[in-house]
Each structure stands twice: as C-alpha cells, then as structure tokens.
From Swiss-Prot:
It holds the Pfam family IFT43. Residues 75-95 have a biased composition (Basic and acidic residues). GO terms for cellular component: cilium; cytoplasm; cytoskeleton; intraciliary transport particle A. This is Intraflagellar transport protein 43 homolog. The keyword Acetylation applies. Residues 28-46 have a biased composition (Polar residues). Component of the IFT complex A (IFT-A) complex. IFT-A complex is divided into a core subcomplex composed of IFT122:IFT140:WDR19 which is associated with TULP3 and a peripheral subcomplex composed of IFT43:WDR35:TTC21B. Interacts directy with IFT122, WDR35 and TTC21B. It is found in: Cytoplasm, Cytoskeleton; Cell projection, Cilium.
Length: 207
C-alpha cells in the first residue's frame, strides 16, 4: 500500500515538474521568437526610413559644358535685366525732376491775325510774246530779218499785213442768226444770176 502511494505521489510530482519545465522552455522560446521578430521589424523600419544612397550620376563632358553654358546664359540675362531696370529707374527719376512750366496769359503776346496779310507766292512765270511784240522786234531789229544768216526775209516782212486786218473778233454763233445770214446771201446771189440771164434776153436786137 505504501509503495502504491509513493508511486502516485511521484506521478503527481512528475507532471507538475515537467509542466513547469515545459512552461519555462516555452517562455524562453517565445521570448527568443519575439526578440527575433522585433529585430527583423527594427531592421525593416530602419531600412524603410533610411533609403540606400543613390549611385552618383555619370556625366560626360557635353553635360558639364551644357550646364556651364546654361549658368552663364542665366547670369548674362540677369545682368541685362538689372541694367534695364537701372536705366528705367534713372529715366523715371530724370522725368520726375523736369516739371514743365506753364506760362501765364499776361506773358503771352496777343497777335492780331486780322491785320496780318500773307505774302503772295513768288512764282516765275514765263511771259508769252504777243503778235505786237513780234512785229515790233521784227521791224526794229535787223537780225530777225535773216534766217540762219543766209535766207533774207525782207520781202516777207514788206508784205506782212497789220494785226487789226488779220485778227478777227470773237463772235458767238447762233444757229438761227447764221441760217438767216447764209440764206440771205444765197438768195442775193441767185437774184444776181437771174438778172444777168434775163438782161440780154429782154434787150431789143439792133438792125
């Protein structure tokens, strides 16, 4: 009986001790797993927060030259803009300094435009010689009586008629008046012809 009781007690103790041992081991394993997981998580967070450094760009000489040219162009454009702004500011300051002065009405001299007469334009007009001037020159100067120094015009000048005989008066023509004049002249000519024809017929014959 006593042996049986001792075996039962040992069995009771063994599972308790084994359970205790199993619990400690499990706790250790769980803590190790947690530590491992936390280490992984921390490494992941570190890798996520701090990205790896980017590799340096490989730039050739053309890229460097283009960058330098662009920088120089920017500087030149900025200098030009600064120069323009300075000139504009100087011009504005100069314009602001010169204030136009408006004269008073008393200082302005009143001009009477009514009394002023415009001067006639001086235009040189070539004077046309009249027949009288030509006749006078032809009669006075003997040089005009010869043409080209060889042809003598004295016979022609002696036969020239005066101006009042050659020149006709300007008379306005009326159709009715012209018709009556022409018809009367024609009738008078016809009458003269008729009388000439009838004259020898009506005369008596001489024996």
């Amino acid at each position: 009986m006593e042996d049986l009781l001792d075996l039962g007690e040992e069995r009771r103790r063994c599972p308790a001790t084994s359970g205790a041992k199993m619990g400690r081991r499990a706790q250790q394993e769980s803590t190790q797993a947690e530590n491992h997981l936390s280490g992984k998580n921390s490494s992941l967070t570190l890798t996520a927060e701090v990205p790896p450094p980017k590799p340096p760009r490989r730039q050739g000489r053309w890229a460097e030259a283009s960058v330098k040219v662009s920088k120089s162009q920017r500087r030149a454009s900025e200098e030009i803009q600064d120069h323009r702004l300075r000139q504009q500011s100087l011009d504005r300051s100069d314009d602001g300094g010169d204030i136009p002065v408006i004269p008073d009405l008393e200082e302005v001299q009143e001009e009477d435009f009514v009394l002023q007469v415009a001067a006639p334009p001086s235009i040189q007009v070539n004077r046309v010689m009249t027949y009288r001037d030509l006749d006078n020159d032809l009669m006075k100067y003997s040089a005009f009586q010869t043409l080209d120094g060889e042809i003598d015009l004295k016979l022609l000048t002696k036969v020239l008629a005066p101006e009042h005989e050659v020149r006709e008066d300007d008379v306005s023509w009326d159709w009715d008046h012209l018709y009556t004049e022409v018809s009367s002249e024609l009738l008078s000519e016809w009458d003269a012809l008729q009388t000439e024809k009838e004259g020898p017929v009506g005369q008596p014959a001489h024996t």
